[in-house]
Amino acid sequence: MKSVYEIYAEFLLGRVRFHLREETDVFHASLASFIDAKYVASASLSAALYERIFTTRLICESANPPGFVPSQDNLAVQLQNLRDREDEVINRNRLGFRAITKQLAEAGVLTSAEKQEYDTFYTDVRNPVAHGLTSRLYERFSGRVPDHPFEVDSAYESVYRSVAHTLIDKIYFLMGVRGFRKE
C-alpha cells in the first residue's frame, strides 16, 4: 500500500484520473482531509467516491446503444444518452452496488474475481463507514473485539486513519493503476 503522500503526489502529477471533475474534487478533498488529520471526513468522502466510481463507469460504459459511433457531430445525442442512462440506473432502476458490478462484469469490464473482490470490500469497508458502524471497523482494522464499550470510541481516530488510508489506496489503484476510467 502506498502512503497517502505518495498517492497525493501521483494525483497532483495527473496520474490519477476520474470520469468527472466532481469525482476529482472529492478525491482531492479526501486527500486534503487525510493530510489535515480529519480521518472521519476523509473516510466518508472516499467511501462515497468508491461507490460513485462504479456507478459512473457503468453509465459511461452503457449509455450509447450497440454500434453507436461517438463523434463531434453527435455530441448532443451522446449527452442525452448519458443523461437517460444515469436516470435509468439511479432513479428508475435504483441499482445497488452489487447490481452495478454485476452489469459491469456482464459487459466484460470486470472479471468475476474482481466483482467479488469489489463487492466484498464494499460490504466490509464502505458500508460500515457510510452507516457509522465504527465498532465493525474497529474489529476489522485492529484484528480484535473491543474489551469494553469505550475502547472503540477512544480509538476511533486511529481506526479511521487506517480506514481512510485503505479507501484512498483502493481508489488510487482503481483510477491510477488499473485505469478503470473509460477512455
Q: What do these predicted ranges mean?
A:
Residues 61-116, 136:
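Flexible secondary-structure boundary motifs
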Residues 38-45, 96, 117-121, 125:
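Residue-level detector of well-ordered alpha-helical segments, enriched
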Residues 45-46, 64, 142:
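"Short basic amphipathic alpha-helical interaction patches in structured regions
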Residues 105-183:
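Charge-enriched, short contiguous segments at helix-coil
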Residues 1-40, 65:
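Charged alpha-helical initiation segments
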Residues 27-31, 35-59:
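Short, hydrophobic, well-ordered secondary-structure elements
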Residues 17-21, 91, 120-123:
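Alpha-helix N-cap/helix-start motif at coil-to-helix transitions, marked by capping-box chemistry
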Residues 46, 53, 57, 61, ...:
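Generic structural signal for hydrophobic core residues of well-folded globular domains
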